[in-house]
């Protein structure tokens, strides 16, 4: 929402359009289809902007978390004067939406601009549930991301990790010990996804570099989509038209990048083979592939970067993690930790869970939409109603997580799922959402994140670039939870 405020202040067209459409917006407000649905209470609205005056100043998920303390864990927020959304910040109601009535709330409500880079909303994350969505999701999970296929990637992931460690060492030597690890992690994940899409023999560094740039460019222009959705007539403004042109340029870049590979004869265990076998249009195939990169690369790499930032800020946690990794590596004669080792490392798993709790990569998930008339808390919900679950709020519930704003992996070391509090912690930790629309790439994401963090924490001691200059933990919301200031760190080789 901070992007919206900046755009409004710097763009007189938006203010002009707001004034000229006041009467039309009021007309739309009072002539909406009548319904017996009663919207949950929420903060008082202003004409045209709804609650947007309350949503700036800090991260949106934090603002909504604080508003929920005043207006209730199920409240209505108006993004502009015509786009109400129910925001859920309570685990019981979140499970009602995400799990117990998963099929009722399984539709999507996406900004129009996203049609351009999703083949008209025909990708897994953008399409409503139905036969197409089910088939596409099963193909990704049962073919490209099958356990057998992921296991076949282990040797390649380990080679990529060895290369990454060497590259980081070289960067540190040339830069007084300081590195910027994020791009290195992104490219390792890009290579992994490329092999799952095209086959194990795929090795094209130019493609990896170009895809990396395409993702970065799309993330850069993504913020405007929320503004256009808030103001109905913003889509007619020059600034919005400029954003559309930029997304269309990104669309062409992706098409030109992926389309030459559609004529390959890929192995049967690849995502490309599955997509072609379903006789999908080339446009659907291209953007189903792009979606795997868009949602997989930054989410995994940024979560690893957040974890490293926490380890720098909490040296005792970093040392405790290193001791576990070093002990295991010594006993098992490891130069690098292997993918199959990851689940045997208890403290590593606790650090991973705590990182995902503190910095969920999609803190507001992707908004759900009721695909039929249903209910919430026993009250009627109309078909088409938008519902957003604030994952951040669930993860920072002080009644579930003691001292919730403190990074404390130990909280996950002795969780008893039979204990009431342990069960509440398990149910409240939803970094990948839950229910039928849970992240399709969850297992791959957890695997790559865990593997990367284990080896980077084992290979190097991570510290501040200068004494007292701690990593900036402020974030900004795009497709995923971005670092406002990308991580820089000083590294020293441990082994």
UniProtKB/Swiss-Prot annotation:
**Swiss-Prot/TrEMBL catalytic activity:** (S)-cheilanthifoline + reduced [NADPH--hemoprotein reductase] + O2 = (S)-stylopine + oxidized [NADPH--hemoprotein reductase] + 2 H2O + H(+)
Which body tissues produce this protein? Expressed in roots and at lower levels in stems and leaves.
Q: Can the keyword Ligase be found in this entry's annotation?
A: no
InterPro entries listed in its UniProt record: Cyt_P450, Cyt_P450_CS, Cyt_P450_E_grp-I, Cyt_P450_sf
Q: Pfam families, alphabetically?
A: p450 (PF00067)
GO MF annotations in UniProt: (S)-stylopine synthase activity; heme binding; iron ion binding; monooxygenase activity
Q: What induces it?
A: Up-regulated by methyl jasmonate treatment.
Q: Which UniProt keywords apply?
A: Endoplasmic reticulum, Heme, Iron, Membrane, Metal-binding, Monooxygenase, Oxidoreductase, Transmembrane, Transmembrane helix
What GO biological process terms does the UniProt entry carry, in alphabetical order?
Answer: isoquinoline alkaloid biosynthetic process
Subcellular localization is given as: Endoplasmic reticulum membrane
Q: Mention any one GO cellular component term assigned to this protein in its UniProt record.
A: endoplasmic reticulum membrane
**Binding locations of heme:** 439
Q: Report the transmembrane regions from the record.
A: 11-31
Pathway-wise, it operates in: Alkaloid biosynthesis
Q: What is its EC number?
A: 1.14.19.64
Report which superkingdom the organism of origin falls in: Eukaryota
| Similarity section | Belongs to the cytochrome P450 family.
Role this protein plays: Methylenedioxy bridge-forming cytochrome P450 involved in the biosynthesis of isoquinoline alkaloids. Converts (R,S)-cheilanthifoline to (S)-stylopine with a high substrate specificity. Catalyzes an oxidative reaction that does not incorporate oxygen into the product.
Protein name per its UniProtKB record: (S)-stylopine synthase 1
The gene is CYP719A2
């Amino acid at each position: 929402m901070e992007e919206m405020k900046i755009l409004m202040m710097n763009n007189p067209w938006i203010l002009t359009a707001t004034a000229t459409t006041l009467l039309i917006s009021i007309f739309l407000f009072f002539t909406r289809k009548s319904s017996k649905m009663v919207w949950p209470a929420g903060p008082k609205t202003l004409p045209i902007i709804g609650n947007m005056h309350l949503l700036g100043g800090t991260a949106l998920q934090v603002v909504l978390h604080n508003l929920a303390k005043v207006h209730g864990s199920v409240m209505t927020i108006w993004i502009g004067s015509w786009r109400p959304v129910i925001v859920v910040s309570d685990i019981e109601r979140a499970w009602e939406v995400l799990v117990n009535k998963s099929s009722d709330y399984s539709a999507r409500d996406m900004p129009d601009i996203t049609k351009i880079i999703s083949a008209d909303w025909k990708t897994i994350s953008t399409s409503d549930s139905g036969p197409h969505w089910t088939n596409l999701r099963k193909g990704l999970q049962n073919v490209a991301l099958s356990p057998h296929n992921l296991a076949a990637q282990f040797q390649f992931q380990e080679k990529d990790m060895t290369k990454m460690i060497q590259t980081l060492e070289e960067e540190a030597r040339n830069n007084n010990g300081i590195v910027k690890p994020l791009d290195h992690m992104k490219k390792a994940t890009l290579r992994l996804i490329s092999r799952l899409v095209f086959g194990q023999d795929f090795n094209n560094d130019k493609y990896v570099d170009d895809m990396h740039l395409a993702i970065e460019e799309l993330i850069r222009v993504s913020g405007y989509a929320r503004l256009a959705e808030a103001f109905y007539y913003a889509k007619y403004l020059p600034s919005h038209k400029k954003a559309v042109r930029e997304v269309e340029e990104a669309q062409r870049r992706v098409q030109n990048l992926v389309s030459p590979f559609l004529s390959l004869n890929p192995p049967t265990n690849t995502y490309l083979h599955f997509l072609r076998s379903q006789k999908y249009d080339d446009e659907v195939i291209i953007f189903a592939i792009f979606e795997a990169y868009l949602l997989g690369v930054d989410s995994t790499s940024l979560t690893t970067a957040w974890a490293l930032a926490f380890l720098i800020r909490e040296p005792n946690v970093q040392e405790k993690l290193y001791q576990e990794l070093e002990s295991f590596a010594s006993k098992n004669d490891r130069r690098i930790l292997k993918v199959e080792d990851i689940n045997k490392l208890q403290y590593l798993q606790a650090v991973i869970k705590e990182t995902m709790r503190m910095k969920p990569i999609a803190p507001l998930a992707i908004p759900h939409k009721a695909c039929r008339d249903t209910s919430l808390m026993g009250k009627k919900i109309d078909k088409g109603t938008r519902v957003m679950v604030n994952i951040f709020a669930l993860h920072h519930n002080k009644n579930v997580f003691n001292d919730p704003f403190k990074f404390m992996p130990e909280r996950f070391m002795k969780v008893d799922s039979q204990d009431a509090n342990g069960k509440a912690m398990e149910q409240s930790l939803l970094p990948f959402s839950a229910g039928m629309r849970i992240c399709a790439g969850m297992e791959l994401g957890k695997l790559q994140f865990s593997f990367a963090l284990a080896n980077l924490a084992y290979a190097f001691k991570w510290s501040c670039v200068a004494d007292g200059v701690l990593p900036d933990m402020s974030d900004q919301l795009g497709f995923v939870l971005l670092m406002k200031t990308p991580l820089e760190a000083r590294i020293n080789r441990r082994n």
